Amino acid sequence: MYENIRTLGYVATNYTTKPLNDVLKEIDTYAAWPRVSNDTRLRVDGIFFDETPSTYDPFKYNYLSHASQAVKNGTRFRHHFVVHNPGLIPPALITSPTFAQNSYTNLSDITVIFEEKFDKWLDRSTFDALQSHRIRRSKFAVILHSLPNLSKKVLDFVVEQVQEAADWVFLTDVGTKDEYYHSFSTIFEDFVKSVDGGAEE
C-alpha cells in the first residue's frame, strides 16, 4: 500500500435529504467488503461523502456527525478517513472569522472547498477568497475540471496557485459533464509531475 493514497467508498448524502439510515447502510456495505469477498485487500480506508451541505445548519450537522462517526468509530475501515464534498463553499463564508465554529470541517479529515470548471476558479472573488483563508490547507481539497490546453510551465503555475488554497488537489482537462472523473485525462502525467514540484522528465 502507498501511504499517500486513500481508497474511499462513495456515499452521496443528497445534501442531507437522503434518509440517514440509507447512508449508514451504504457505509456498512463498504465496511463489509473484505468479509463478503473473503479478501482483506478490498478493505477501504474511509468514505467520500458527496453532496454535503456548505452552509451550517444544526440538523444537517447532526446528520453528518452520525454519518462521520459511523466511519470514525467503525473497526472495519483502515484509516477511518472522512471526506466531505459540498462542491463549493461560498467565498464570504470561508473567509469568515467564525467559519471553523460554523461549519462541518471538524467532522471530516478533508473538505472539498471548490469543485468547478477551471475558468470559474479564475474569477477574482473566488480566487482571492480561497487563497486568503486562514484554515489549515491540509483540511481542504480543490477539484478543477475542463482545463484548457496548457503548457507544462503554465500547468506548474496553476498547481502552485491551487496549492495555496488546499493541500489536496485534482485537475483534469476532461470537460464533458458526468465524465470528469471516469478516466485519466490527457494531462494526468504532467499534473502528477507538477504536484511533485514541477519535475521534468
List the predicted regions and their residue ranges:
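Glycan-processing catalytic domains of CAZymes
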Residues: 1-201
